[in-house]
Design a protein with these regions (language model features):
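Polar, S/T/G-rich
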Residues: 1-229
Length: 229
């Protein structure tokens, strides 16, 4: 009589633990100042008809911050709104064999925000388990003809959907200059490992400190996911 088979393995899927976060940032000009402030503080500030706090001051929209200026002639710049940016969308895949290069020509920018990520990140074992994986990217600037690594980034975790992250590059070279993204991790050659990488966009940032004299304003920053992304 033959031996019975071993106990069947039930595949285990690790939880997704990578989540993109995008902040919505806006300044709203209320009118000519000076005027009185919000009657009920943050409860008086509505986003999609939803107040930032309830009557007891507890957050209704988590992660939101707001600043207020009444419209004085000598008012200070709103904190957290000291820069403006122009985003250029790319959405291009980055492979080990083909780094992606772009040229920056804008003369007056102070910094660059580089947004990149993975289409998904998961490794499936021979037993069907779906586990976290990792992938490494280099973000480089060309300085005096040489490629210099400014950021060495490893994305480590699991996600079955797109995940994006951002880094800021300061101390930029004289314009024009080249920027490139290099994939250090070998490209996957099997469906068992999903780790395609992409360069989503770059944002040219100019540092500004505007006071908006004689204008009453509200500045709001909130996680875009609170309103469907």
């Amino acid at each position: 009589m033959g031996k019975g088979g071993g106990k069947a393995h039930t595949p285990v899927e690790a939880k997704d633990n990578l989540k993109s976060t995008q902040m919505m940032s806006v300044i709203d000009a209320i009118g000519e100042g000076p005027i009185e402030g919000p009657v009920k503080g943050l409860q008086s500030i509505l986003v999609n008809k939803t107040p930032l706090t309830d009557t007891d001051g507890n957050p209704v929209i988590h992660g939101a911050t707001a600043v207020w200026r009444a419209g004085e002639q000598e008012q200070t710049p709103p904190e957290g709104f000291e820069s403006s940016g122009a985003e250029t969308g790319l959405g291009v895949e980055v492979t080990k064999a083909k780094p992606v290069t772009r040229t920056i020509t804008s003369a007056n920018i102070d910094r660059l925000r580089v947004t990149f990520g993975v289409q998904s990140l998961v490794e499936t074992t021979s037993k069907g388990d779906r586990n976290p994986a990792s992938v490494r990217l280099l973000i480089q600037l060309q300085r005096n003809g040489n490629w210099v690594t400014e950021k060495d980034v490893t994305i480590n975790g699991k996600t079955t959907s797109q995940f994006l992250a951002s880094v800021i590059l300061d101390n930029l070279p004289p314009r024009p200059f080249n920027i490139r993204m290099v994939r250090e991790t070998a490209d996957s050659t099997t469906d068992q490992l999903q780790n395609k990488t992409l360069w989503s966009s770059y944002t040219e940032i100019i540092d500004v400190k505007q006071c908006y004299p004689n204008t009453a304003i509200v500045g709001l920053q909130v996680d875009a996911e609170q309103f469907g992304g």
